[in-house]
């Protein structure tokens, strides 16, 4: 694959939220996960874990938990006061593609949930201890939380996973929103170990639509220091 072919693959990938009523072969999903584990990761800790869900009852349970969590938050007076959970409109004049057709989360033929295992980092302990007596170390604690190397590592694996699924002709979308309101419920369904956090939900299937997309010019998001 040359650079132009790779660019075509990357630029044609879209978040898919509507799927054909067609099963996804388990072997394809296993292959995609195996390739995802070749993503770069801090200290080669490989602190990711993947749950491939093909059982429709489990997918429905996860979908129901997600909806219940969002409905719970929607019922808060704070949510009403802030104008709801819908993201703000883009700036006037900005070109926005039409929203993709959506299926219910429970309609996805398959789902991959991505976990991040917790592990102790000696550096974290050292910085935390020093922060008790050192103002700069206190700032370093904040920086370390922002950097979150283990989250970055798993996110790299997810990016690889989405690209491989696209190459296989499968559509997927990277979701975190439902976990903000139902993470504990979803982890209970999966029976995750106590040292693991589910950080992403990825419904997968054969696409039922072909959404378009736009990107900011690279000049708006990149600076060259000469």
Language model features with spans:
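Acidic, surface-exposed loops and disordered segments
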Residues: 1-226
